[in-house]
Amino acid sequence: MHRYKITFAYDGSNFAGFQIQPGERTVQQVLERAVNKIAKKPQPPLMVFGSGRTDAGVHALGQVAHFDLPYQIPGPSLVRALNSSLPLDVLVKEATEVAPDFHARFDAHHKRYRYRVVGGEFTNPFKRNYTGHYKYPVDVERMQTAAQDFVGEHDFTSFVASGSQATSNVRRIDEVTVVRDEENDEVVFDFVGNGFLYNQVRIMVAFLLEIGNGRRPVDDVMRVMKAKNRDLARGTAPASGLYLVEVTYDSPANSQND
């Protein structure tokens, strides 16, 4: 068997998330259908393993997955074959043969998530599936200052949703930026870390928006973090504004044939 790593994008609007769920349309489901089609429907069916799960409505610009094929195929040919079999809301960007022990999830080094927020009193119908809406004015400098308290290794118990299956809530965040995109009239949050908990990014965004609006003091992150109390963080930003931008690996070591 030959193992392949793919990088792909998807519009999460019409998916019930990444992971296969009975009776639901998911990203993993349509990927496995395409992979098994080009592999001539082997038995048992081939499985696709993603770098992580995204929830319903969450998008990806650079999600990563791996799977095995019973034959060797050049990367560009695999990209064409998969895209010919996938629905229009999924696009494979790159395919590479990798070492047989490569794992998209367990070998991931960092992930970058982006959250886009649009303002205004009412929701823009053309952005409603691709941004979060926050109708109150916000101070980007306040949010950028407060966001730096998320950087480092912390126990993020206050910023994880119920239903998390993680055995530890300790994670490391290496970078957080908050900028105003004047051209698109959006505020854009970027988070880079070694992994994120269930709804963690969306909870942190909602928290920072309250700081930006003056409903919380700028130094409130550490107070709530130390309390380890989810109720103190309050809201969760909508799924529609969240994007998995990229997943990084110590990759030339994992690559076989580029």
UniProtKB/Swiss-Prot annotation:
GO terms for molecular function: RNA binding; tRNA pseudouridine(38-40) synthase activity. Its EC number is 5.4.99.12. CDD domains: PseudoU_synth_EcTruA. It catalyses: uridine(38/39/40) in tRNA = pseudouridine(38/39/40) in tRNA. Pfam families: PseudoU_synth_1. The active site is at D55. It is an enzyme of class 5 (isomerase). One of its GO terms (biological process) is tRNA pseudouridine synthesis. Substrate binds at Y113. The keyword Metal-binding does not apply. InterPro entries: PsdUridine_synth_cat_dom_sf (IPR020103), PsdUridine_synth_TruA (IPR001406), PsdUridine_synth_TruA_a/b_dom (IPR020097), PsdUridine_synth_TruA_C (IPR020095), TruA/RsuA/RluB/E/F_N (IPR020094). It comes from the Bacteria. Keywords: Isomerase, tRNA processing. Homodimer. Formation of pseudouridine at positions 38, 39 and 40 in the anticodon stem and loop of transfer RNAs. Belongs to the tRNA pseudouridine synthase TruA family. This is tRNA pseudouridine synthase A. It comes from Limosilactobacillus fermentum (strain NBRC 3956 / LMG 18251).
